[in-house]
């Protein structure tokens, strides 16, 4: 969608949803469960130090995924869309997993409170005016993208194949 053609506060014409809010939450949490397993597949030192081709370490990517999802969840629930502030990256794997788990619980409790009509309302997202559903889909897409990077990192470390702890990408 061309953000110049959409104004904040506009609601798109009602069309039947492809996913219900409950299905969206289940889909999103399925991705999050798989990404959590991938975070755990890294050793502590590799999580925050190892990267390929100038990309960021997976610990930094994990924090970005957590921060983006937390920001979008807060926006969806509160219906306020300020410029994001990401906060400090957790310094250890256990801290990242704890923040991840706290956010998972928040999503389970708070996402069902978002009125379904809000998803079709155009909101002033920090990358341009878009329907609110685009924000949720962005968080999911961003996670899939970064999780793919994590798989590349683990494979380049030789952590792939039968008997290793790398979860298959289809097990969400």
Model regions: which residues?
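Acidic catalytic patch
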Residues: 111-126
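Short, contiguous alpha-helical
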Residues: 2-13, 25-39, 44-86, 124-172
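Short, low-complexity N-terminal intrinsically disordered segments enriched in polar/charged residues
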Residues: 14-22
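Helix-adjacent hinge/juxtasegments
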Residues: 74-114
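Soluble or luminal CAZymes and related metallo-dependent hydrolases
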Residues: 20, 27-31, 99, 103
């Amino acid at each position: 969608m061309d953000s110049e053609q959409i104004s904040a506060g506009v609601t798109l014409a009602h069309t039947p949803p492809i996913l219900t809010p409950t299905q969206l939450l289940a889909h999103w949490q399925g991705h999050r469960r798989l990404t959590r397993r991938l975070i755990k597949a890294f050793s502590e030192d590799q999580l925050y130090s190892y990267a390929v081709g100038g990309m960021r370490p997976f610990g930094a990517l994990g924090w970005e995924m957590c921060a983006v999802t937390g920001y979008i969840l807060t926006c969806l629930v509160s219906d306020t869309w300020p410029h994001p502030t990401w906060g400090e990256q957790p310094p250890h794997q256990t801290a990242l997993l704890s923040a991840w788990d706290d956010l998972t619980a928040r999503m389970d409790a708070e996402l069902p409170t978002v009125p379904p009509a809000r998803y079709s309302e155009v909101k002033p997202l920090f990358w341009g005016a878009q329907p609110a559903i685009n924000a949720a889909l962005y968080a999911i897409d961003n996670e899939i993208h970064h999780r793919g990077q994590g798989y590349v990192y683990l494979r380049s470390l030789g952590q792939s194949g039968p008997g290793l702890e790398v979860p298959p990408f289809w097990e969400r």
